[in-house]
Swiss-Prot record:
GO BP, one annotated term: DNA recombination
Organism expressing this protein natively: Campylobacter jejuni subsp. jejuni serotype O:2 (strain ATCC 700819 / NCTC 11168)
Protein name: Protein RecA
Statement: the UniProt record of this protein carries the keyword Nucleotide-binding: yes
GO MF annotations, alphabetized: ATP binding; ATP hydrolysis activity; ATP-dependent DNA damage sensor activity; damaged DNA binding; single-stranded DNA binding
């Protein structure tokens, strides 16, 4: 760059710093790009699939899927992990359906959790913006986008048409929120539901998420949560096998996926993941129905081995570290070749 151009650019940069504050615009070569901070998900596999050890801080996240697929359970685990690291969390319960006892079972410190049950969508998003702008809250969860009903729709008559109101509300709110959460390093997670597209036929997925397209574009990470099997013991259902696909990721390679057990009343089974990934990486030995780690037998059968690890957390922690050391943060879970055509 010649001297005249450089002087003009320096003058423009000084003007921007004076108007908007120092660091408004930086040349990447002048400062090493900082490692993106993250909040753990409570799942070893999903942390690895996300590429940075969890969901990124200072970003908007969307977690979506069918009903009873494990979306709220996953977000409660993320809240618990954030609190363990000393973070402050807020839960915007637009569905008015938060089960406090279940949240406690999952490790959430409900005494320190800030909860709001807004009456309409504008109020919910105003609350999110206000507490995000404070800079004192690390994680905000909104459950769910489908329940963010505009005030005009609530106050109107039953048969009134309110086409596109919710989509416009979300678009307006997200335009404001994106800059705020980045500046304040606050993570905002929107839980969303799926709907069938009207008139969809022939090609592409017939499913879509509620609230218009704005969240798809503004979200740095989008997670698709699906139940893939029911777990049974003596023919009695005891939980679900859940698959999470990272369908969008702006902070690491997308299209990776993770599977884990969600046990009824207990939430995500960390022990089940340790056995699965331990066997996959030859950290845990499997001989017939028996599982063992080093010279210690964990148990006969997967459920017995899970119970052993639950009773011996020091061994579970040792296996966790071995898995993390073996896989690292970059090389983690193999992506699904079938997912390359997804968003």
């Amino acid at each position: 760059m010649d001297d005249n151009k450089r002087k003009s650019l320096d003058a423009a940069l000084k003007s921007l710093d004076k108007t908007f504050g120092k660091g408004t615009i930086l040349r990447l070569g002048d400062k090493e790009v900082e490692q993106i901070d993250s909040i753990g998900t409570g799942s070893v596999g999903l942390d690895l699939a996300l590429g940075i050890g969890g969901v990124p801080k200072g970003r908007i996240i969307e977690i979506y899927g069918p009903e009873s697929s494990g979306k709220t359970t996953l977000t409660l685990h993320i809240i618990a992990e954030c609190q363990k690291a000393g973070g402050v969390c807020a839960f915007i319960d637009a569905e008015h359906a938060l089960d406090v006892k279940y949240a406690k079972n999952l490790g959430v410190n409900t005494d320190d959790l800030y909860v709001s049950q807004p009456d309409f969508g504008e109020q919910a998003l105003e609350i999110v913006e206000t507490i995000a702008r404070s800079g004192a809250v690390d994680l905000i969860v909104v459950d769910s986008v489908a329940a963010l009903t505009p005030k005009a729709e609530i106050e109107g008559d039953m048969g009134d048409q309110h086409v596109g109101l919710q989509a416009r509300l979300m678009s307006q709110a997200l335009r404001k929120l994106t800059g705020i959460v980045h500046k304040m390093n606050t993570t905002v997670i929107f839980i969303n539901q799926i709907r069938m597209k009207i008139g969809a036929m022939g090609y592409g997925t017939p499913e879509t998420t509620t609230g218009g397209n704005a969240l798809k574009f503004y979200a740095s990470v989008r997670l698709d949560v699906r139940k893939v099997a029911t777990l049974k013991q003596n023919e009695e259902p005891i939980g679900n096998r859940v698959k999470v696909k990272v369908v969008k990721n702006k902070v690491a390679p997308p299209f990776r996926q993770a599977e884990f057990d969600v046990m009824f009343g207990e939430g995500l089974s960390r022990e089940g993941e340790l056995i699965d990934y331990g066997v996959k990486l030859d950290i845990v030995d499997k001989s017939g129905a028996w599982f063992s780690y080093k010279d210690k037998k964990l148990g006969q059968g997967r459920e017995n081995s899970k119970a052993f690890l639950k009773e011996n957390p020091e061994i579970a922690d040792e296996i966790t570290k071995a898995i993390q050391n073996s896989m690292g943060i970059e090389g983690m879970i193999s992506g699904s070749e079938d997912d390359e055509g997804e968003e």
